[in-house]
Amino acid sequence: MINSSIITYCQFLFMSISLISMLTGEVFPVTDIMINGDQDSRVNIVFLGDGYTQEEMNDYIDDVGEVVEGLFSAVPYSNYINHFNVFAIEVPSNESGTDHPGTAYDCGGDAGNVFYADTYFNSTFDYYGIHRLLVPLNTSAAYDVLIDNTPQWDIVFLMVNTTIYGGSGGAFATFSRNAASTEIAVHELGHSFAGLADEYWYSGWETANMTQESNPLLNKWNPWLYDNNIGIYQYEDPGYNWYRPHQNCKMRYLGPPFCSVCAEQTIKSVYSILDLIDSYFPENLELTVPVFGTEYFSINPILNIPNSITIDWFIDEQPMLQGSTNLELEASLYSEGEHEVKVVVKDLSDLVRNDPLNLLESEVIWNMTIECNAEGDLNMDGMVNIQDVILLVNNVIGISADVTCADLNSDGEINIQDIIILVNIILGN
């Protein structure tokens, strides 16, 4: 008869192995396409490929490169390329291609072109009965791959290995390898990243570029009205009570650039993830500085193209320096005690006019304490002696100017009591 403790141990071992198996995901090769900084300080774009076999991985990486080149040639992404990293996860499918069940009402010439492929993310056309709506059905597999390989993703492109036109927004900006693939990708990114609506009629909801408010004074893109052809344009029927800001935007047609409203929303989406300041020094925001010491402050902002970043330094809310990433502070120029050093960084891009949340502004504040570190050495010659007494006496009787670190009893006054304390220090009392 088998010992019950052995059975219990085996059951525990089996459960442990099963748990480890469930928690251990599959790791795939990840190619760095474009790296501009640490993943925790950039918008991280991750590409997933569906319908690429292992033998087609080189084609997949080439396809990713073409899309990335096109994306960062488009305004405003071209202006903010320094704010992004791009990675491509190499996930092979068993078969090349995707699914087209031929079930959509608008398949047209592709109605009889029915095919299926065994792909990793099970992408398919004809979703919701719309031929061009190309989606990955196995989204849980996509999330697993992202978590196991690039857990700090912000944007996901899912590129499907077929030349038939199609794509979709949502959590994953999905598109095919059609001749218009880059345009499709950038358009779908408008949905999945910037939360933009289509500017052709699909359905209505309030977004940065879609509204039911036709009053110019109340309209959300009021700061742009009548510039760059921005207006309040009615959607076609049945969306006659909804309005878009432009008649020829990338969110309506492939080919044109983003309108001013959509470009602005894209930039604000970047800054909803990132801080303008990449890093700063000192990293410790609570500082103690000797009264005759020098403290160095610096920041590393993420610059856009062309650069529209401004930098302003303040000490105790008083302007000190503009335009520099560095500040050298001589503590002797300030009183003993608490001081605030602040740097304010702003992006004054003319592509943004409406920023009520101040997303295009960032600051760092250091709390600095200036204190004496050599009690009694008033002339800072490294010794406490009669010369310091003479200096203090002259100050008390009004012959010389104020002396730093002379308030030896910290009562807020420099007087005979401080002279007595200084003499006692010299005498060793």
Would you name each region that the model predicts?
Residues 11-21:
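Bacterial N-terminal signal peptides
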Residues 26-145, 351:
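Propeptide-to-catalytic entry region of secreted or membrane-anchored zinc metalloproteases
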Residues 57-60, 165-186:
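Short pre-active-site segment immediately N-terminal to the catalytic Zn-binding motif
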Residues 23-27, 275-280, 340, 363-377, ...:
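Low-complexity, Pro/Thr/Ser/Gly/Ala-rich linker/spacer regions in secreted
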Residues 97-100, 139-175:
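Catalytic zinc-binding patch centered on the HExxH motif and its immediate surroundings
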Residues 182-199:
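Active-site recognition of the HExxH zinc-binding catalytic motif
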